[in-house]
């Protein structure tokens, strides 16, 4: 059986509780599914769930989680840079470096450097 991620997460459009449960799981892959599954919402212009789950995962110890969260933040920024920066300005100093680097990958170089140097 092959289900596309958006088919699965589309079913979560009404009840998002499973995503939050996965985000708090001890299993790395369940936490990663929680954040990557929010791409469905991002593609539909809904960023709130991604940002809530990203906040939950800020202190995660796993590099794969850092990369996934940074990736989803970058996806938000592709659609609404203001929304991404609102989150980053509040949290970039506490974010794991890999997460921050992934999130700001597409920023203009001067702005990227300011984030990396903690000057925002």
Give residue ranges: language-model regions.
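Alpha-helical scaffold domains
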Residues: 1-120
């Amino acid at each position: 059986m092959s289900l596309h991620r958006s088919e699965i997460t589309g079913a979560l459009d009404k009840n998002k509780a499973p995503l939050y449960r996965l985000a708090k799981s001890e299993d790395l892959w369940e936490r990663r599914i929680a954040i990557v599954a929010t791409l469905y919402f991002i593609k539909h212009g809904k960023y709130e769930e991604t940002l809530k789950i990203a906040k939950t995962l800020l202190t995660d110890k796993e590099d794969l989680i850092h990369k996934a969260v940074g990736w989803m933040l970058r996806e938000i920024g592709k659609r609404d840079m203001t929304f991404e920066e609102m989150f980053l300005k509040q949290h970039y100093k506490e974010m794991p470096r890999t997460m921050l680097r992934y999130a700001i990958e597409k920023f203009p170089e001067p702005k990227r450097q300011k984030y990396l140097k903690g000057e925002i």
